[in-house]
Each structure stands twice: as structure tokens, then as C-alpha cells.
């Protein structure tokens, strides 16, 4: 029987914990990352912390800066534009594929997630989690493993953006209607319309994100592992 390496399991736990802290802003962009302080705070040895930090660095969530050391990565204005531009392309493709390949059960799941959004109006934390679930369900409904991998990589980068764009006034009703349009097109097996609806959704999300960054608004959404709203 193969024995489990305690440091390996602790490293996995530390990785998940630190990623959650980056997502909810506990470790915000630009924050110093000190291995010994994290080990002490999490009450574990430095070995699993080192393993977790290596993984986060490989994902681009931690970077090394001269004269500063390791810090949580920051996305500048151009990086945000590039991130959303790529998401528009990939999510549009995911919606197109979903219209072709999604099962009836997967379409029903998407529809139920959209319905649940309406039941949680005003609860930014719940809405952000539902939004995350909706997009993940959309990615998987496309049934393309390579597209899924690319989208999950972008999803990791999204957690560096901080709070939800639902902090932008009137964003939720628009985003909700956009989700409905995506699901409707997928249910009707209309790849062209599904892609167009998804692309429009991401373009509008990009505008909301840039507005959020310009205004320095702060979301009520805290203490959640869900990445920023799309």
C-alpha cells in the first residue's frame, strides 16, 4: 500500500487556502509573500508552503520583483483588456460548441443556475458564486478538453482582479439577461447566436470591469473563493 506524503497533502491544502485568500482579497495584488510568515500563520512547516507557492507562481499568481521579492501579481490596464479580449474569443467558442454538443441535462443545469440568480438579487457573494458556476458549466458543456484547459487558465487570472463587477450600478440585470440569452441560444441549438450572445456578454463585462477599476469601487463580495464576476 502506497503511503501518503504528509507534506504533499499539506501542500495541497496550503495551495487551496492561499488561492482562496488571493481570490477574496486577503492577499491582494502587490502584497508581499513571505514563506516563513505564511507557514507560521497556517501552522504548518515551510516545506508544504514552498510547494504551494511554487504552484501559484507557475500559474502566474505570484511573481518575483527585484528588491521586493515574491508578491501577488498585479494586472495593469492593458493586461485586463487582453484578458477579456481572450475570454471573449474562448467563451464565444465554448458557447458555440455547447449549442452543438451540450446534453439536455447540461442545458437544464445552465437554466437552473440562471433562475437561481434572480432568487439572490442583492447578495453579491451568492451572485458571484452562481456566476462562477454558470461559466464553469458553460465551459464544460462545450465538450472540448483543450478549450476547457485554456478557459480554466484564464479563470485563474481572473482572481487577480479583485471584487465583483456587480458593484457597478445596474450591472446585475444586464448580466442576468445576457445569461438568459446564452442559455436560450444553446437550448435552441443555434451555434451562431450562442457565440454572439456569449461574446456580447464578455464585452459588456469588460466595460463594467474597466469602469470598476476607474472608479475604484469596492464590492460587498468578500470572503469567497469565487473569482471576480465575469
Go through the PLM ranges and name each one:
Residues 80-88, 187, 195, 199:
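Short amphipathic alpha-helical segments with heptad-repeat character
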Residues 1-100, 211-230:
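Short linear motifs at protein or domain termini
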Residues 171-173:
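Active-site loop of classical SDR/Rossmann-like NAD(P)-dependent oxidoreductases
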